[in-house]
Design a protein with these regions (language model features):
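A short, proline-enriched helix->beta-strand linker immediately N-terminal to the Walker B motif
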Residues: 121-125
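Catalytic Walker B motif of ABC-type/P-loop ATPase nucleotide-binding domains
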Residues: 127-130
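ABC ATPase "signature
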Residues: 186-187
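Helix-to-loop junction immediately C-terminal to a conserved catalytic motif
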Residues: 14
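ABC ATPase NBD coupling module
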Residues: 31-49, 79-80, 153, 193-196
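Conserved ABC ATPase signature
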Residues: 102-106, 110
Length: 209
């Protein structure tokens, strides 16, 4: 399975579970899932950044500090350089005014946007989203989806697990429907999310509509 940089996609990332077979290519790193070392796994993971459904922010650090932590620790930026870049990323997700606030003072939608800015900080070849709106109140979902829409417009490669079907239809160029670890249907959003000959897919679409 190959992911071309700069194309928004929608499917499940195999290394979140132990894979049975296949080849994964992200950026310039390729991993044969039938036989790989911890070093190869680490190299592949360095090509990605994860956005969790429950934010996973450091509660004792401000929004800006959450974004700059990896820049200082891993990219060896100076604190000043990291703060300048971190503020630019927070501005990108509409949160520059909240830079000095702690997570406890932010709404769920704002926390998730900080999480997205933090993921962008490491400049990954692919952003991985695990149900990014499932922990949010309905009125906060839109602000997070809008940030992801903007990333898609900028041709950011994204791997998103979601139940937001209308959103998937808008931003994805490829959709994979999975159940119990098996791919049941895949194709363009129109092919997968419209009427289909796949009975299980039809059942799912009816249940969410």
């Amino acid at each position: 399975m190959e992911m071309s940089e700069g194309i928004p996609v929608l499917f499940f990332f195999p290394l979140l579970e132990e894979p049975d077979s296949g080849v994964i290519t992200i950026g310039e790193v390729t991993l044969d899932t039938s036989k790989y070392t911890k070093k190869e796994e680490y190299q592949l993971r360095q090509q990605t950044a994860m956005v969790f459904q429950n934010y996973n922010l450091f509660r004792n650090k401000t929004a800006l500090e959450n974004v700059t932590e990896s820049l200082v620790a891993n990219k060896k930026m100076s604190k000043k350089e990291a703060e300048t870049y971190g503020l630019a990323l927070l501005n990108r997700v509409g949160l520059s005014a909240q830079a000095k606030q702690y997570p406890v003072t932010l709404s769920g939608g704002q926390q998730q946007r900080v999480s997205i800015a933090r993921a962008l900080a490491v400049e990954p070849h692919a952003l991985l989203f695990d149900e990014p709106t499932s922990a949010l109140d309905p009125e906060l979902v839109g602000e997070v989806l809008q940030v992801i829409r903007e990333l898609a417009k900028q041709e950011t490669t994204m791997v998103i697990v979601t139940h937001e079907m209308q959103f998937a239809k808008e931003v994805a160029n490829r959709v994979v429907f999975m159940e119990d670890g098996k791919i049941l249907h895949e194709g363009t959003p129109e092919e997968v999310l419209s009427s289909t000959t796949n009975a299980r897919m039809n059942q799912f679409l009816k249940s969410i509509n």
